Design a protein with these regions (language model features):
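Regulatory modules associated with amino-acid/nitrogen control
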Residues: 1-91, 115-130
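A generic structural motif
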Residues: 44-49, 103-109
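A cross-kingdom feature marking solvent-exposed beta-strand/loop segments within repeated
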Residues: 91-106, 112-114, 130
Length: 130
């Protein structure tokens, strides 16, 4: 990998973004997802997980692909998500971002995958598809 090129890995599975009420129970199956995120705020719980683990009764946005920034991002690094989000915004692609301690994940609608790959590659990103 070129040291100046950021590698992005597209996870194989299809994902959903779900909203639960604050007092709802989080389904146990979610932890079986290859990638998942649980975020709690004073008013809601947001879940990101493989689509096959969602259940009836959730408010759901289906058919998302996950793009993983394939490196450990030091907290001193600035602008990684800003650059990616600007490129995708210029292409009229909506995103949902999840960050972990080590790296960032950008979710895009599955229907936008082809154009997302194209514009990111045109802007110097290395895209790995699984």
């Amino acid at each position: 990998m070129n040291d100046n090129k950021i590698r992005i890995v597209i996870l194989e599975e299809i994902y959903s973004i779900c909203r639960l009420e604050k007092n709802d129970t989080i389904p146990d199956d979610i932890t079986k997802s290859n990638f998942y995120s649980i975020t709690s705020s004073p008013k809601e719980i947001s879940l990101v997980c493989e689509q096959k683990f969602i259940r009836d009764g959730m408010k759901i946005e289906k058919d998302w692909k996950v793009l993983k920034i394939d490196s450990i991002l030091d907290f001193s690094l600035i602008g990684i998500i800003s650059k990616i989000s600007t490129i995708l915004a210029d292409a009229k692609i909506s995103i949902f971002v999840v960050s972990t301690y080590d790296t960032d994940y950008v979710l895009i609608k599955k229907s936008n995958l082809e154009i997302t790959v194209r514009v990111l590659e045109e802007n110097g990103y290395e895209i790995i598809k699984y």
